[in-house]
Curated annotation (Swiss-Prot):
GO terms for molecular function: ATP binding; homoserine kinase activity. It comes from Bacillus anthracis. Keywords: Amino-acid biosynthesis, ATP-binding, Cytoplasm, Kinase, Nucleotide-binding, Threonine biosynthesis, Transferase. It catalyses: L-homoserine + ATP = O-phospho-L-homoserine + ADP + H(+). HAMAP family: Homoser_kinase (MF_00384). This is Homoserine kinase.
Amino acid sequence: MIPLSIRVPASTANVGPGFDSVGIALSLYLHVVVKEKSDKWQVIHSFEDSIPTDDKNLIVSTACKVCPSLSPHIIEVTSNIPLTRGLGSSASAIVAGIELANQLGKLNLTIDQKVQIATNFEGHPDNVAASILGGTVIGALDGKNVSVVRIESKELGVISLIPNEELNTDESRSVLPDVFPFHEAVKASAISNVLVAALCQKKWKVVGEMMERDHFHEPYRLELVPLLPSIRKCAKEFGAYGTALSGAGPSIFILTPYEKRQEIAEQLARVFTSMKVCELEIDHRGITVNKKEHIGL
C-alpha cells in the first residue's frame, strides 16, 4: 500500500469567554503513520504505559466506530502535544481516528461531516473543529447540529505556559456550576460576543481585554490554576494582548503581537521557571494527509 501519514495540530479552546465554542489550532502535532495490515490492531508509540497499544487506543477505537468494517493495521503514533494539559490531545486523537477511518475505509467524508462526527465524539466543537480546519474557529452545538465559522488570525503570536502537573478535564469541569443565573449569563455572553467580533475585525487589543473577562469558567477554575493572575499581569506588562486558561487548563494560553512573541516568551521563562514556556504559532492548515511520504517523522 502507499504509505499513509496523518498530521493533526493541537488546539486551545475557549480563549477566555468563548466557552466550548472558540478554538485555535496550534503548531504542536500528532502524527499517525499507517503501516501494513495485521490480524489485529497494533499501535506503536513511546507514550506512558497507560496509553493502549491495541484497539482500545482512542485513535483506533474512534476509527472503528466511524467505520466498523476497517481491516486492522499496524500504526505508529508520535506527538509533541502534552497529554492532559488543556492543549487538545484527546481531540487530536479523535480527529486522527476519523481521518484514519476516512482514508482506509474510502469514506470520502466532507470537512463538515468530519466536524460533525468529531463533535459528536468530543461533545463540543471548539478543539476538534480547530484541529480539522486550522486557524481560529467559532462553533456552536445545538442539539445534534453543529455550525462552525473559520477566521484567519495570521497577525497573532501564541505562547503557552505548560506546568508539570496534569489536570484531568473531568476534574476541571467538576468545579463548574450546574446552574448559571440569567443575569450572569447575559453578561458573560455579551463579553463572548465582543470577543468574536474583535477576532473577526482583527482588533487585537479588544480581543485581549475580552479574553481576560470571562465569567463562564475561569473564576471557578482559579483554585486549580492559582498562577493564572500573576502570569496574566506579567504577560500584559511584557506586551501581550491577553492571557487565558488553555481549555480546561492547567496550561496557560497567551496571545501576542506576532513579531513580539519570542521576546515575551523569553521574559516569561525567566519569571516562571517552574513551567515550560513554548513559543508557538497558529496552525492555518488543520489536518493534513500525505499518501506519498511519512511527514514529520
